[in-house]
Structure formats: structure tokens, C-alpha cells
């Protein structure tokens, strides 16, 4: 009995380590979605290093570096600090990764919440 447990333990540890690892979303993702100010077209370029997420968010309003990005398992979050018509706007993203899609909810400066789906560019 002890021998079976000892043999199974390394396999269990490996399975847990792989499942807890951040999903690699490195690359380009696109999204088109409706907002209070019209249809938005985004290209996100992500780079994952461990649980740290960096990259850019490019929209019709310009390109900005994403900040405070994390990927933990299938959960992803980051902040986009956008200059919109001369006003600073903080947009906070929280999402769930599922294969080649990320379902995001973004909080636009506390004034609006918007749902969108970003798809991996292949």
C-alpha cells in the first residue's frame, strides 16, 4: 500500500502543478464589441511570464501598454489607461480563458461595464 502511494505521489504533484500553471495567452487577440460610444475594435498583444501579463491594447483611440496584468490558471486581469478625448480613463479588465477565447468584463472608469470576447489570432 505504501509503495503504491509513493509511486502515485509524484504523478499527483505533476498533475497539480500543470493545472495550477498560468494558461499561456502570449500572442495577438482581437475583439469587436458595442459600447455606449459605439462599436470598438481592439487588438491585444499579450506576453505571459509566469503569472505576469504584459503587452498592449490597440484600439481606434491608439495603443497603450497594459498595466497590472496577471494570469492565474484560466483567470486574466489587467488595466488599460486610455486617453479618451483628452480625458484619462481607467479601464479594468477581468476575464476567463477558454481555449482560443477570453470572455472579458471591463469596467470603464466606474461608469459602465461591458462584456466582450477576444479571439486568438491564428
Model-found features: residue ranges?
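Bacterial N-terminal signal peptides that target proteins for export
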Residues: 1-9
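Bacterial N-terminal signal peptides
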Residues: 8-17
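Sec/Tat signal peptide C-region and signal peptidase I cleavage site
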Residues: 18-22
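Central antiparallel beta-sheet cores of small beta-barrel/beta-sandwich binding domains
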Residues: 23-122
